[in-house]
Amino acid sequence: MPRPHGSIGETKFKILAIIFSNESTGKESYGYNIWTIMKTQFHCYLEDINLRNIYRHLKDLEEAGLITKSAKQGVENAPKRQLYSITENGRQLKNKFNKYLQIL
């Protein structure tokens, strides 16, 4: 049975772990980067079409107050890049996504 829209499942915990890890190492978190890490480290969302699912999860996490989004100008004529940061509420869930931090 599918989870209710906006619930926090394993995919969202993986995304929180990625953003937390990126912040800890001084890296930026943006949709494409998060999707790439999901593919290479967690071996999920392997198809290009799955990128849109990552953005849906990011939107859910933002609406839940677990991450924030800010815009950063892209290089040259590229569009602005949406950067994601984990909030204090998101950090409080570290015990739920800690197992994924160990993979990263």
Model-assigned labels for residue ranges:
Residues 73-74, 86-91:
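Accessory beta->alpha helical hairpin/"wing" motif in late/C-terminal subdomains of nucleic-acid enzymes
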Residues 62-72:
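A short, conserved structural fragment
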